[in-house]
Amino acid sequence: MLLSRAISVLALLACIRCGVHAQNTEQNLKTQLTTDSAMITSQRLLRTSVDFKDSEERWPTESSRIRSAIKDYFREFPEKVSIAMAIRQIDAHGVRHVEKVLSQYKFPAADQGNIRLAIIHHKAPK
């Protein structure tokens, strides 16, 4: 065991002295830098190509604040959520946010039905 370890240390020293190991490391480093810069560029492109209509990725706090307000509004009333109440929320915050709240949170079946009817009513051609 000691002999095999000594041989591997001598082989490593010989490679380092000849420069073979250093050249290989330099090539690997160049490849690694190229790969890293390509990854950074692609991430930057993804970050800057966000659709401004769906600004969730850029400003998640604003969207989550709106959705939290919608959720709290619907859960505030012990009685059934009416279609008119859902339409008011759609007019105030937009259909996309109300749909997202409906998909993320659980509401009683009657409330879900009324909210869906309000969304359908809002999306229907006038």
Curated annotation (Swiss-Prot):
Induction: Expressed during host plant infection.
Subcellular localization(s) per the UniProt record: Secreted; Host cell
Record keywords: Secreted, Signal
Signal peptide residues on this chain, from the entry's feature table: 1-22
Positions occupied by motif RxLR-dEER: 44-58
GO cellular component, one term: extracellular region
Record's comment describing the protein's domains: The RxLR-dEER motif acts to carry the protein into the host cell cytoplasm through binding to cell surface phosphatidylinositol-3-phosphate.
Protein task: Secreted effector that triggers a hypersensitive response (HR) in 3 Lactuca saligna accessions (CGN05947, CGN05310, CGN05304).
Family stated for the protein in its record: Belongs to the RxLR effector family.
Name under which the protein is recorded: RxLR effector protein BLR31
Organism (species): Bremia lactucae
This protein's encoding gene: BLR31
